[in-house]
Structure formats: C-alpha cells, structure tokens
C-alpha cells in the first residue's frame, strides 16, 4: 500500500493579491458591459494607502476607474484605516494605456472564426472524480474554508464581528493507494481586531469556520490544527504585504495537484488564451471525467500568437482511462472547438462575470445565471462559470461506446 501526503492552500478575498485580482477583473467587467470587442490587459498593485491600476486597453467604453476601484476595496471590507486600508481615502493611480497595434493585427480577422491567439503559450485543464466539484480535495477544502471565513465575517450581527478581511487556509490530506482517506493537518490564519484573546479566536474558528467545512469522516485524533499559529494577526491586507494581480495562479487553479502553464487569469479579456484556453481545458477535462472516460484527466493545449488552430492538444489520464488516451484526444478534437473564437462561443465568455472568478478559485464553482446592465442601460441574461457545465459528457460517453 502506498501512502503519501498532499497539501494545497487558498487565500481570502481580503488577501492583498486577491484585492488586486478583483480590481483587475472589475475593470474588465465594466468595459465588457459597454464594449464586447474590447481588448483588456489590466494589472493592479495595492500597498499602504494606494491602488495602482495599469495595463493596456483598446475600447470605445468609458469607465470611472477611480470609483470602481474604491467600490471593490470597500465591498471586500477595507473601509477604515483602523483595518489597515480604506477604500474611501486611498489614492488611486491610473496608468492604463492602449494595446499595441502589432498585437491587434495578429488577433483580429475579417472572419471571426479565424481569430488568432492573443499570445503564444501552453495551458492545462484538470478534473478528478474524488469530489463532487471534480476538483482535487485539498484545494476544494482550502477554498471553502476561506470562503466560510468571509461569510461569517460579513454576516449581519455576526458573533465574530472581530474578524478582518485577510485570511489564508491550508489543508494536508493523507492518500492511501491514490485515494484521500484523512485530513492530516489544517492551517487557518485570519486577520482580527486587536484585543481578541487567542483562546477565544481558536474556539470560534474551530466552531464557525472549520467544523461546517471539513468532512468529519476525514478528521481523526491525529489531525493537527494550526489556527493563527503566530498568535497574532492584526496587521494584514495591503499594509502587511504588497498585492499584485496574477500572483496566486496555483490558488486560482488546482492547488498544485495538476500542472500549470504559467499564465495568470485576472484582468485579461477572453481573446487572451492564458485565460480562455485554460477555462476550455478545464471544461474538456471535466466532461471527460463526468462521461466516465477516466477517473482523472489532464488536458494540455498550446498556441502560437496570431494563429487560430492550437499547436497541440494532449491528454493524460494517469492510467485511469476506460479507453486509450489517444482515443480520448480524438474525441476531444471532434467534440470541442479549441480555436480562440470557438472557445469564446462555446463558453459564452464575452460578458461581465470575471470579478466573480477572482476569489475562491476559477474552477470547481457552480454555473450561475445572472443579469447585467450594458452601456445603454439594457438588461441582459448571462451565465458565469459556464466552463463548469458537464453538458457534453453524454455525447462523449456515447461516442466512446461505453455502457
């Protein structure tokens, strides 16, 4: 019997890097609401008393970038200098310029189907049947812990009103013969008001954050709990650490369980395959696993700048495939259009929804129907996390001739 440990981590929406991600995606959403043809590459840095928003944008839209940035910060919960950052009074510096015409000529085409990739690169998508979300268990639980921290913190008349926005989680699982069997260790660090006793904090976190999330069947006498192990976490957010867009790419994806092509997501419109192709690869892998073609599936795609067709598509099922990986690859090529325009159409990616993805993981979330208002004031229906649908699983299973 083989036995090993595996660890993943997550961070809350109040973590400095996640503040930056959310601002970048809020800018993208605001522009897409007015201009579906926009090209956006938005980067944000937050540090004590200031948010710097930079990047390259080509659009006919106008947005109030300062007001938008302040709203994101305030909605997270940074509304006072006492907390360490105040969206009302912080400086907002706008350093956004235009996208290079050299890139435009490589991406734009008269025939939309021949739209070229916005850059070269390689992207991975992954799925496993070890959780209902088709995500690796360690990252799934890590996300849910910090999500629960935010839920409790924002709850009206919360008994844990002393919680502050910045938080981190980490979960270590024990695997026996490739199957998760127990939680070996949990780390939960949460920012808090001064004056909170360590004993009270530990008890509250156990009852209100850990207990509702962690599966009881995986907890045992030997499970180690590290709750605010430094003993104090008052200074947090952008005061404690500088935050930058795109610095939490492993948190955003599979927690280190699957490979990563290196490209970040937030602030990038769907013409950037760093984002759209990673979403598509997840969609493909999840449908392969949901179809029962494999227990685990990793899909890699790659592109050349200005070229529509992927330069490669490869599939690995780690010995769990019910049919050969080569046959799964052929089915993928037949059932999924992985050209940039094909991905955008397949997943309906050109509308505001991206700020929703910027915290608690881009994958393993439930598709959500919502409405948004465009630049003319008209209302539109849309779906976020469309890449989490398993609507092609049945067709894949039938094509594979599995009973």
UniProtKB/Swiss-Prot annotation:
E.C. number(s) listed in UniProt: 2.5.1.6
Positions contributing to K(+) binding: 43
Keyword Membrane attributed: no
Chain residue ranges for the region called Flexible loop: 99-109
One GO CC term on file: cytoplasm
Pathway this chain belongs to: Amino-acid biosynthesis; S-adenosyl-L-methionine biosynthesis; S-adenosyl-L-methionine from L-methionine: step 1/1
Top EC class, one word: transferase
Keyword tags: ATP-binding, Cytoplasm, Magnesium, Metal-binding, Nucleotide-binding, One-carbon metabolism, Potassium, Transferase
Residues binding Mg(2+): 17
Catalytic activity from the UniProt record: L-methionine + ATP + H2O = S-adenosyl-L-methionine + phosphate + diphosphate
UniProt-listed Pfam families: S-AdoMet_synt_C, S-AdoMet_synt_M, S-AdoMet_synt_N
InterPro entries: ADOMET_SYNTHASE_CS, S-AdoMet_synt_C, S-AdoMet_synt_central, S-AdoMet_synt_N, S-AdoMet_synthetase, S-AdoMet_synthetase_sfam
CC cofactor: Mg(2+); K(+)
Positions bound to ATP: 15, 166-168, 232-233, 241, 247-248, 264, 268
Recorded coiled-coil stretches: none
Source domain of life: Bacteria
Co-factor remark: Binds 2 divalent ions per subunit. Binds 1 potassium ion per subunit.
Localization per record: Cytoplasm
Residues noted as binding L-methionine in the record, renumbered to the chain: 56, 99, 241, 272
MF-aspect GO terms: ATP binding; magnesium ion binding; methionine adenosyltransferase activity
Gene Ontology terms: biological process: one-carbon metabolic process; S-adenosylmethionine biosynthetic process
Keyword Metal-binding annotated: yes
Listed NCBIfam families: metK (TIGR01034)
Family according to the record: Belongs to the AdoMet synthase family.
HAMAP family: S_AdoMet_synth1
Full protein name: S-adenosylmethionine synthase
Name of the encoding gene: metK
